[in-house]
Amino acid sequence: ALLVILKTDALATAASAFLRGLNAQNPAQAAPTDLSWLGFSYIAFRLMHVLRDLHNGKRANMNLREFVTYVVFAPSLLAGPIDRAERFAKDLRAPYALNISVLGEAGTRLVIGAFKKFVLADALSLMALNAFNAAQTQSPLWMWLLVYAYAFRIFFDFAGYTDMAIGAGRLLGIKLPENFNNPYLKPNLTQFWNSWHITLAQWFRAYWFNPLTRWLRGTRANSVPLMVFIGQISTMLLIGLWHGVTLNFVAWGAWHGVGLFIHNRWADFARGRESLAKYERAFRIGGVILTFHFVALGWVFFALPEFNLSLRVLARLFGVNV
């Protein structure tokens, strides 16, 4: 409930106004940022992971100190990766010595991450898509350049932070899981989501998609295509809403949910067809290009604050002025 309040501007503003009233402050000055809680999204995921496993009879073998350290582990607090409690505790208990090898490994990861985030991402942010340049740009070519810049900016920013988190964790004796694996080089959307924010996708697969599809098998909605559609669209909608309770994040989640379902149906159709096998290399190259552009178009909803502006940008990309 607290996560929903913090992610919803209207609810956060109402809660802030209520608390201001209790403290004899002016409720009219309430803002959603009053209740910002640094890293709470990832704290919530860790808590839900432990509670869900406990509900399923899988109690994490951790003492209180290990549990608190896991929940608020600083390097991965802001943007992940989302570690598993048992794996984290195993690293925490293992003998650890800070030696030259560890320093070299961690230092390399920190430097690479800093370069991605503070050099590449910051440079790309100067021309990446935003509300201001989206409203001003009329040329389809320039609009595509803005979208491409945003796609690579968000990757280098997020992957750079992850590299630094993994490097910092290594210095403390914790081997955080990898979170990115060349996502823009994947030939389909399913492989993209197995390579982008890997631990988030694994979390939703384990605690939402898999339980939901198991439940659907016992209902009337037990046809495979329908189960896949409901599972994928609901999972991606939840991931979108987790980023923020806005229409744009709903649209972004729906965009990816529909894309995943289309790929699932295509993969099922193409499986075992010898007539398509001889074009495997062409399909792979074409798939990389198509998948990247599908993801890049989806970033339009992610980058902009207004749904109508996002639709206008998508139209302008294809030479339609609305």
Located regions from the model:
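Membrane-embedded transmembrane alpha-helical bundles that form the catalytic cores
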Residues: 1-322
